[in-house]
Swiss-Prot record:
PANTHER family: PROTEIN N-TERMINAL AMIDASE (PTHR11750:SF26)
The keyword Nucleotide-binding is annotated on this UniProt entry: no
EC number(s) from the headed UniProt entry: 3.5.1.-
Organism field: Schizosaccharomyces pombe (strain 972 / ATCC 24843)
BP-aspect Gene Ontology terms: mitochondrial protein catabolic process; protein catabolic process; protein modification process
Start and end residues of each CN hydrolase domain: 1-286
Sequence similarity: Belongs to the carbon-nitrogen hydrolase superfamily.
Keywords: Cytoplasm, Hydrolase, Nucleus
List of catalytic residues: E43 (proton acceptor), K121 (proton donor), C155 (nucleophile)
Lineage: Eukaryota, Fungi, Dikarya, Ascomycota, Taphrinomycotina
GO cellular component: cytoplasm; cytosol; mitochondrion; nucleus
Descriptive protein name: Protein N-terminal amidase
An MF annotation (GO) of this entry: protein-N-terminal asparagine amidohydrolase activity
Amino acid sequence: MKFGCVQFFPKLGKVNENIVHLRQLLDQHSEALQSVKLLVFPEMCLTGYNFKNSESIQPFLENVTSNHCPSIQFAQEVSEQYRCYTIIGFPEFQNSNGISTLYNSTALISPKKELLNVYHKHFLFETDKSWATEGKGFSFEPCIPELGPISMAICMDINPYDFKAPFEKFEYANFILRELEHQQMVSSNVSRPIICLSMAWLVSDDKVIDASLPDIKNLHYWTTRLSPLINSNTDAIVLVANRWGKENDLNFSGTSCIMELSQGRAILHGVLKAAENGIVVGELEK
């Protein structure tokens, strides 16, 4: 099964311009994307990330029930064109009884353009807290047609909660383990999960980062945060789609990659540099 992760430098608040550049990027990789089954885009892919408050992000919020939802519409067009599942990050608002709640979200779109699931970022980074509400919990879908078990997570979700929880608590990785244990109790035929990480992850060190290479420190850290899965010999596919570039005071690290967790090891099947627009594609047994 073929998977892809998109790495992109969005311009803050320039949604239409970002869509144009993303289409160009997809066109440049159209041959590699043929027969891809799942394509993952970064966190807040069309809007950019570094909004300082709810007022500044207000014009870019999307409601999935609205006719005007650029991120969902773009992902649906991608899914239709490549006949694939698509995951995309976007800033969301929901209305209930006249009250708006804002979320940092990802959406899963089917090859038939169906909106299958929307996930709300559970662990918020400092920038998110200026406008977003914390999601109620992590995400695990036990059986998506053709894909099997899948989990969407967003950036800070794999960190210790609020950077205050014990490092060894490994909240997200242990959540996946518990979900898999439950699925194995229900069925003896559970395929390995696909862990989809949409990111706006910062560089590990502004002073030493080499933009012509992957950010190896971050790559190692992401693997470490999934170590309970590795140490338990859990087989999984990990798709990391991270943005790159500098946005005001934040510098993002790229290094989008495809990893396989198998027999107690993390195997890298493809990785992009810290500073480039690109799509990493890999084919793995599901």
